[in-house]
Amino acid sequence: EIMPSLVGSEMCIRDRASMVLSLVSGYSLPLGVYYDTESVSGGRANALSAAERTACAVAFCETIRGAGYRAGVYSYASWFYNALNFANISKYNIWIAQYRDKLSFSYKYNIWQYTGSGRVNGISKPVDMNIG
């Protein structure tokens, strides 16, 4: 349910969101569809300003919402604090990744990803674990 943000313009993001909608059409997604924004080595979005990055997240979420799905933004705490204008995305669901025993995040959130090394019976590799 996460779409990585590897493109930089609002137009590209809307196109990407439309592609996601074609893939999820007909499915019930109670948690929604999330826009994944984070620093990626060599990623085009790394060069964007916080305002541009936020505008892309809003464009994605509004496109998803327009199709009747819940929309949200996924990232880690320092990215939410420093690379986005949180006030402009706070109306969407927030999925925060912070690998600690206790979450330290100043804003309202919906889902907390607390580890990337969880274990689940029947799955041999580590998995992300979330509370929401």
Question: Where do the model's predicted regions map?
Answer:
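Active-site beta-loop-alpha junctions enriched in small/polar residues
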Residues: 9, 38-40, 76-78, 99-101, ...
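Alpha-helical scaffold elements lining the catalytic groove of polysaccharide deacetylases
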Residues: 10, 14-25, 42-59, 63, ...
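Single conserved hydrophobic/aromatic residue that forms the stacking wall/gate
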Residues: 1-8, 12-13
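Acidic (Asp/Glu)-rich catalytic clusters
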Residues: 20-29, 103-106
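Aromatic-lined carbohydrate-recognition surfaces of secreted/lumenal glycan-active proteins
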Residues: 64, 68-82
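Functionally critical loop-and-helix segments that line ligand-binding/catalytic clefts
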Residues: 87-132
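Distinct, well-ordered alpha-helical segments
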Residues: 14-21, 80-89
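Structural recognition of the beta-strand scaffold that forms the well-ordered cores
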Residues: 5, 31-37, 70-75, 93-96, ...
